[in-house]
């Protein structure tokens, strides 16, 4: 991790159906052992299913709303100061917040029973309404940061 200069980020790839970088990131997170076509099929079906159950016209509207509801604003990072380790609250960069939100959605969808497609659709639906396990995880992350704000002066 170089401290010399800012990293120049590559342009994000977009998915073939919606032309969205967020959907491409979701597909990449779901993909296992390089099987992109299976991940795409599951993701597109889940997005369509979550859109049909809500009153949204645009299929990406539900996904974007779900990601915005899950994206954390604060998190805690461990910082060692003189033999003691403190959980120091830090602001989350937008890119990291999106990555965490996508990861949480996929992990909590995997934890649900039934087919992954239905579980992902239900998790997206719940997240768009401000409910579900991923939203609870975001709230827990914020509570942890709030509880440890006394250590905010250790921020680096």
Regions found by a protein language model. Give the residues of each.
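Strongly charged
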Residues: 1-33, 37, 44-156
């Amino acid at each position: 991790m170089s401290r010399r200069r800012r990293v120049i980020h590559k342009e994000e790839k977009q998915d073939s159906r919606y032309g969205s970088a967020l959907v491409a990131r979701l597909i990449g997170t779901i993909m296992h052992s390089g099987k992109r076509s299976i991940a795409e099929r599951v993701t597109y079906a889940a997005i369509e299913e979550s859109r049909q159950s809500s009153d949204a016209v645009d299929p990406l509207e539900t996904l974007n709303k779900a990601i915005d509801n899950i994206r954390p604003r604060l998190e805690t990072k461990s910082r060692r100061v003189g033999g003691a380790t403190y959980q120091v609250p830090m602001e989350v960069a937008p890119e990291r917040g999106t990555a965490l939100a996508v990861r949480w959605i996929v992990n909590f969808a995997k934890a649900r029973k039934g087919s992954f497609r239905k579980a992902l659709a239900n998790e997206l639906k719940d997240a768009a309404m401000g409910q579900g396990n991923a939203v609870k995880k975001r709230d827990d992350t914020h509570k942890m940061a709030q509880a440890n704000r006394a250590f905010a002066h250790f921020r680096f």
